Amino acid sequence: MFVKKGDKVRVIAGKDKGVEALVVTALPKVNKVVVEGVNIVKKHQKPNNEHPQGAIVEKEAPIHVSNVQVLDKNGVAGRVGYKFVDGKKVRYNKKSGEVLD
C-alpha cells in the first residue's frame, strides 16, 4: 500500500473532500486508512468504567485508500511511484518527482 502512518494526505473524494491531514493508522489488509479529523462517526458506547452512564463518542472511521493522495514536502498532491535510489526502494511523487521517504 502506498500510504504509510504519518504521511500528510489530501482527501480527494467523499464528504471531507479537500481536507489535508495526517494518517493516524494504515490498514493494509483492507486497503483503508484512518485520517486525523476525517470521516467522524458517532459510536454509541455501553456503560463501562470510563463512561458509567454510557455515551455517544465521536471517533474517526477508516476511509478507502483510493480516496486520498499523498502530499510531498511542498504540498503537491500526486500519485505515488516506486524507484531505486542508491540500491534502496523509495516512494516518490509522480507529479513533482520528489522522494517521499
From Swiss-Prot:
<dbReference type="InterPro" id="IPR014722">
    <property type="entry name" value="Rib_uL2_dom2"/>
</dbReference>
<keyword id="KW-0699">rRNA-binding</keyword>
<protein>
    <recommendedName>
        <fullName>Large ribosomal subunit protein uL24</fullName>
    </recommendedName>
</protein>
<dbReference type="Pfam" id="PF17136">
    <property type="entry name" value="ribosomal_L24"/>
</dbReference>
<dbReference type="GO" id="GO:0003735">
    <property type="term" value="F:structural constituent of ribosome"/>
</dbReference>
<dbReference type="GO" id="GO:0019843">
    <property type="term" value="F:rRNA binding"/>
</dbReference>
<comment type="function">
    <text>One of two assembly initiator proteins, it binds directly to the 5'-end of the 23S rRNA, where it nucleates assembly of the 50S subunit.</text>
</comment>
<comment type="subunit">
    <text>Part of the 50S ribosomal subunit.</text>
</comment>
<comment type="similarity">
    <text>Belongs to the universal ribosomal protein uL24 family.</text>
</comment>
<keyword id="KW-0694">RNA-binding</keyword>
<dbReference type="GO" id="GO:0005840">
    <property type="term" value="C:ribosome"/>
</dbReference>
<dbReference type="InterPro" id="IPR041988">
    <property type="entry name" value="Ribosomal_uL24_KOW"/>
</dbReference>
<comment type="function">
    <text>One of the proteins that surrounds the polypeptide exit tunnel on the outside of the subunit.</text>
</comment>
<dbReference type="InterPro" id="IPR005825">
    <property type="entry name" value="Ribosomal_uL24_CS"/>
</dbReference>
<dbReference type="InterPro" id="IPR008991">
    <property type="entry name" value="Translation_prot_SH3-like_sf"/>
</dbReference>
<dbReference type="GO" id="GO:0006412">
    <property type="term" value="P:translation"/>
</dbReference>
<dbReference type="Pfam" id="PF00467">
    <property type="entry name" value="KOW"/>
</dbReference>
<dbReference type="InterPro" id="IPR003256">
    <property type="entry name" value="Ribosomal_uL24"/>
</dbReference>
<dbReference type="InterPro" id="IPR005824">
    <property type="entry name" value="KOW"/>
</dbReference>
<keyword id="KW-0687">Ribonucleoprotein</keyword>
<dbReference type="GO" id="GO:1990904">
    <property type="term" value="C:ribonucleoprotein complex"/>
</dbReference>
<keyword id="KW-0689">Ribosomal protein</keyword>
